[in-house]
Amino acid sequence: AASDVYKRQQLNQAQLAKTLFPIGGLQKSEVRNIAAEQGLVTAEKRDSQGLCFVGKVSLPDFLQQKLATKKGDIVQVANTHPMYAKTPENTPASLAEKFVYSPEDGNVVGTHNGAHFFTVGQRKGLAVGGTKEPLFVLATDVQKNIIYVGEGKDHPGLYRRALWIDQADVHWIRPDLQTDQPMMVQARIRYRQPLAKARLHQEENGMYLVFDTPQSAIAAGQFAAWYLDNELIGSGVIG
């Protein structure tokens, strides 16, 4: 069953001290049964998907209503590009380093209506055919309005082992566990993603989160959350 614990990642102890979760120990099916017994109309309501507050409209459509469209190129980068052959040093900084793309790194395979409508790892909405496997967004250049894509979910440009969080964006739900020493945790970088083994490395101006195995589609601006024994203890905005 899905857990909403990840969504509580920015709360603090003062807030949690006065918060009750009366159905926190129940499965979703049990809650629906109780609602049905009480005659609540929401008992059979479908689960919400995406952003609840935008109403009955998809997120891309919602954004296009609010943001101006602007034509730009979609550049496909081959899986065999030389940049992917380089082995990073086994340091947090090197493992967290992002691939830097330029138009010369690939071929233009289509156009889009605005790089700001796309995010790393996105597959839908590209409207580019002719490939054996689906295309995924590797990176977006909002300044130049270019989207870089790669073919297949195993494209090396999708994967990194580490990420960086600026100190101002580091939030400890359990500040008593904060430490300057490397700390073994479990972590996730998106809602409902399985927890993965990782290490926290505190630096003077921020923190590295280094996973044991490469993670797909680490997107700047999203939240990373870390756990101890399935307890959510901290989070931060990915830089």
Description of each model-found segment:
Residues T19-G25, M207-V210:
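General secondary-structure propensity
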Residues G24, S29-H171:
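Anionic-ligand-binding alpha/beta catalytic cores of soluble enzymes and soluble regulatory domains
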Residues A2-Y6:
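Short, small-residue-biased leader/transition segments that mark boundaries at the very start
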Residues Q15-L16, K70, E133, Q181-M183:
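Residue-level preference for short coil/turn positions at secondary-structure junctions
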Residues D141-I233, I238-G239:
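Basic, glycine-rich polyanion-binding accessory segments appended to enzymes
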Residues K7-L11, L40-V41:
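Short, flexible, solvent-exposed loop/turn segments with mixed acidic/basic and small polar residues
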Residues Q10-T19:
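Acidic/polar active-site rim loop that often engages polyanionic ligands
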